[in-house]
Amino acid sequence: MPPVRASVSIAALLSAASPLVAGAPPLGDPIIVTGRGLPPPRAAAAHDIATIDRARILQSASGRLEDVLRDVAGLQGFRRSDSRSANATSQSITLRGLGGNASSRALLILDGVPQADPFGGWISFPAIATDRIGRIRVTRGGGSALWGPGALGGTVEIESAAPGDLDPIDARLAIGSRNSRDARGSLMLMRRSSFITASGAFATGNGFIPIVAANRGPADHAAPYRQVSGAVRAVTALGPATELQANLSAFNDRRNRGIDHTDNRGHGVDGSLRLVGKGALRWSLLGYGQKRRFASQSAAINAGRSDSTLILDQYAVPSTGWGAHGDVVRLSGDLELRLGADLRAVRGETREFYQYVAGSATRRRVAGGRSLTTGAFADATLTEGALTASLSGRVDHWSIRDGRLFEQTLTGTTLTNTKFADRSGWQPTGRAAIAYRPGGGLNVLASAYRGWRLPTLNELYRPFRAGADATATNAALDPESLTGVEAGVDWALSANAKASFTVFTARLHNAIANVTVARGPGTFPGVGFVNAAGSYRRRENLNAIATSGAEFGFDLRPRPLDVHLSYSYVDARVRDDVAGHALNGLRPAQTPEHQVSATVGWTSPRDLRLSLTARESSSQYEDDLNQRMLKAAFTVDAFASIPVSRHLAIGLRGENLFDEQIEAGISTDGTVERAVPRTLWLEVTLK
């Protein structure tokens, strides 16, 4: 665009916005817009749901989404590390002990759009700044007819902040330990029945040394990070009961794992359009597109940890995802009927150099494919006095196509050129739920459900290495499915107090796991040579993972006090009789039995905000054979916001205040990697 035309365009935009800035009176009554989707279904009364409100989201000591989600015990990532030091591919989420795999078994959505990486299924947490979030709803348990494939353990629904959540201008700048800096800002512009928001976040730091002091060597150094994200959101009324919502966001993520040749790089762009009708006939129509690109390096380190060498350069992982979702809700007295359909298509591949000799790659690999799921669903909920009964179901057709694995030497000799057979099939999803309110604030609920998940392209086609260990691919993996039942009670003790208790049991059929087949040294199919410090693994479908447990929640909010307690117990066991697996009866990797999170907050009439959060996660196994155990982890975080004036506040934040050693991983030689140590922050907020 020529400079003159750009100046005219910007001037026109400013002119259009000037009535708002000047406070010009509206022409007629404005239509209220919220930017949100349809209200939760009536069936939610029979579901185990935890809600994290905006006030709590903004009081996270780290300011990171994965830390906020830890308020819900039982909702966990594959690793204890957060997105400042973890390998991005390990950042999945799951619920109720359905672990053992770094692909997400819970579905995370933002304004209706799935956020899992199209190729690998991991979550790019730095892409979602907490300042732009209005509310988080966590529904435990599978069988979501509305959201469909991927919601095995449950669903995490994130809503963007509404106009009532935001100030016209909000800027935050924080400095922290190890030269950490965190800057965030947002703008909101409202005009009659429309609003637009723009937000940005920047985080960087020198990082900490991931390897614990007792194991580290000269090759170990701090793990720096640099992350940027931005989002623009526009919402306007198209009529008295119809909203048009447009979202555009982007991120760039760079981090290092604490030794040379272990860089992670990722960036992406998401866009979506959603129409929401909130009249007598409620309806929603969403379309979205995602573009991602990821790169990662892996290194081998010598016995004395004095030197590292590059062994794999995953120089590009381009992927795209797109989809659509539509539903209509009809209310007829005590009956709510919801009908809809959706689809999601993903395509991606990994491009990498491997088998290094004297510091130079000798081979190249390209592996990937595409998949498509399409489904239709229905949900009927009847409310008759104190009783709510819900029956929902959906049918999905899935297909996996164009899978390939190509390997060649850099001199041009083809080593592998495999084109995998296309596959397709059908999968059902369903949930039957009931809730009864006998009085006295009690709500007794029970449900039975079935859900499923399609293997990611990463699981199907990409062999990988993690340190000395190597894992072979398996293009014949079947979809996972889950069946489960649960029962519980919600008790509104008073207007300011609520308690909940739920017991559950579930079985994950065809659970995908990285199964240890042999120990090095040796040369193995699909991965090549593995040294004596490593293990050879292969992705396989286990018979099942059986999980059962209990969850307890308590909220007390007699202003100015705010108390939140969440506890989860899970007994998860592998059920597998396949010869050579030797996993039957063992716990899935990275799956703790006990998790608890407790927060006490206080807000003064003059908006002084204080909170203290303690979390405990019991010991868990690093590996599928249950030979390496990560110790229990206990942390205490603190937050304080001190108002200086109407528009200025000073903040103090502390992560892991007692500087506990949080074990995040143990290699086969016993080397321990830790998660974030004590980190202190000083923050200035301008509104």
PLM features per residue range, with description:
Residues 66, 70-113:
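Extracytoplasmic beta-strand/coil segments of soluble accessory domains associated
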Residues 113-140:
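Short acidic/polar hinge/loop motifs at secondary-structure boundaries
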Residues 144-145, 157-159, 164-174, 178, ...:
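Periplasmic-side early beta-strands and strand-to-turn transitions of outer-membrane beta-barrels
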Residues 205-211, 221-227, 237-283, 289-319, ...:
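Flexible loop and strand-edge segments within Gram-negative outer membrane beta-barrel domains
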Residues 223, 319-328, 369-377, 472-478, ...:
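Outer membrane beta-barrel strand-and-loop segments of large Gram-negative receptors
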Residues 236, 380-381, 435, 446, ...:
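Conserved C-terminal beta-signal and adjacent last beta-strands/turns
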Residues 291-295, 347-356, 397-413, 422, ...:
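Surface-exposed extracellular loop regions of Gram-negative outer-membrane beta-barrel proteins
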Residues 382-389, 498-508, 529-624, 658:
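Gram-negative outer-membrane beta-barrel transporters
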